[in-house]
Amino acid sequence: MRGEGRGERGEGKDLRQGDPSSLVPRPSPLFHRLGLQDYEPVWRQMKEFTAARNAVTPDELWQVEHPPVYTLGVAAKAEHLPRVNNGIPVVKTDRGGQITYHGPGQIVIYTLLDLRRRNLGVRTLVRRLERAVIELLQGYRIDANGREDAPGVYVAGAKIAALGLRVRNGCCYHGLSLNVDMDLTPFSAINPCGFPGLEVTQLRDLGVQDPIEAIAEKLLDRLAAGI
């Protein structure tokens, strides 16, 4: 059941603490399963983690689901705001990109990486994140691709995964989201990533029936191998 194992929502605490099984040891990076968490406390903790890290701080991947929320990137404009008042909060963030939507049934993975230590440029990292999603979809016999003019992953022209990063002192945070089994209706109130008329899709609509937790584990493995 999707609700099992979700973290307790709250502020003013380290969201990575709790059940020790939520920390899955890997050679690099470490992986934390945060469960269902409000967007802003997780964003705040990403910034705090990045500001406090040093040359030997392990890289981490955080997997999370968010309650319904629109997030605006630094390139967002007034015309990108939701066209209807559907009660979903809008949060202005410091990530790259424009507007997107997060909600239950979507895998969000935040990539907290030391790019200098990994000798990675931002463009290379974006391509590797896209490649991890594309390879995951290939495992389900779904043809997908990236786009030079619009970071993310697309299936037959419809967006299935979004990317957005922030780099501070050679280290990045934010990451990617993959639509799995969610209500896509809130996307219709925006121009996803600033593109009018851009369609979105998800794995359930493409015939994938695996539980979201299993899909997340597969994606994590791809990401850990690719970065």
Give the positions of each predicted feature.
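Acyl/amide activation-and-transfer machinery of modular secondary-metabolite enzymes
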Residues: 106-111, 196-204
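Short, conserved charged micro-motifs
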Residues: 120-122, 174, 187, 211-215
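Intrinsically disordered, low-complexity repeat regions of secreted/extracellular protein precursors
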Residues: 4-11
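Short, acidic (Asp/Glu-rich) active-site segment that either coordinates a divalent metal cofactor
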Residues: 102, 172-200
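Well-ordered alpha/beta subsegment
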Residues: 132-141, 203-227
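N-terminal lobe of the biotin/lipoate ligase/transferase fold
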Residues: 2, 16-20, 26-160, 209
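A structural signal for short, well-ordered beta-strand segments
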Residues: 109-111, 151, 163-165, 176-180, ...
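Short, conserved beta-strand/beta-arch hydrophobic-aromatic motifs that form part
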Residues: 74-82, 160-180
